[in-house]
């Protein structure tokens, strides 16, 4: 199986907008037609939780990270995210959980800013985050939320990034985010950013 090698360091570049779009994970899209441009009105996504089916810590690196080998699996528990465009150049976050930050300390904010800065997006986005995945439970809630926002921002502003390109960028947010973009079943190595997709497992209760 071909491994997806994701580098932590990458160069930012400006890419022109394109009609190509990445749709994985999108539940519902509302659009309005204005002249020849299609503008996204609202995008709703599911941010799937994940569990580790096995974990082997192989060594501690000089940068403080641990090298690992583990099987990661998406499960049918998810947060709900709604993205709405804003005319003003800002990122606005709201959530149903009072103790979560709604500024740049939230991973969904960081995810949106990552792409919007790189592609010099001049408008804004509102992120409505409905949390159902337990926080700080090792189920990848924050990472999955960030991954879903990357997918949504890519679609909303028609940035044309492929899944691999989203995964390459997402490692700058967190080691688990690339898997949350990929989803499914995968062998994770390195600090979790080197992913080998595996065959889907039979459905079961966790």
Residue locations for each model-derived region?
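Glycine-rich, flexible beta-strand/loop modules in the N-terminal catalytic cores of phosphate-handling
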Residues: 74, 79-115
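Phosphate-handling active-site elements
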Residues: 117-128, 152-170
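Short hydrophobic alpha-helical segments enriched in small aliphatic residues
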Residues: 13-16
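ATP-dependent small-molecule kinase catalytic core of the GHMP/sugar-kinase superfamily
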Residues: 41-46, 52-56, 60-70, 159-206
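Helix-rich "cap/lid" substructures immediately adjacent to catalytic or cofactor-binding pockets
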Residues: 103-133
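DPxDG-like acidic metal-binding loop motif
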Residues: 108, 137-165, 179
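Methionine residue identity
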Residues: 1-5, 27
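N-terminal, positively charged, Ser/Thr/Ala/Gly-biased leader segments
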Residues: 29-91
């Amino acid at each position: 199986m071909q491994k997806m090698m994701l580098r932590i360091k990458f160069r930012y570049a400006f890419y022109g907008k394109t009609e190509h779009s990445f749709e994985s994970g999108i539940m519902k899209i509302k659009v309005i037609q204005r002249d020849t441009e299609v503008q996204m009105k609202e995008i709703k996504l599911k941010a799937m939780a994940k569990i580790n089916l096995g974990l082997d810590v192989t060594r501690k690196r000089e940068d403080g990270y641990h090298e690992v080998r583990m099987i990661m699996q998406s499960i049918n528990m998810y947060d709900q995210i709604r993205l709405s465009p804003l005319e003003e150049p800002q990122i606005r976050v709201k959530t149903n959980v009072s103790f979560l930050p709604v500024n740049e300390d939230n991973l969904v904010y960081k995810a949106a800013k990552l792409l919007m800065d790189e592609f010099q997006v001049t408008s804004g986005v509102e992120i409505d985050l409905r949390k159902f995945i337990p926080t700080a439970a090792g189920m990848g809630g924050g990472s999955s939320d960030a991954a879903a926002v990357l997918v949504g921002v890519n679609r909303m502003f028609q940035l044309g990034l492929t899944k691999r390109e989203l995964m390459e960028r997402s490692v700058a947010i967190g080691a688990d985010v690339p898997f949350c973009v990929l989803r499914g079943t995968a062998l994770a190595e390195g600090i979790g950013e080197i992913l080998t997709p595996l065959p889907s497992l039979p459905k079961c209760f966790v």
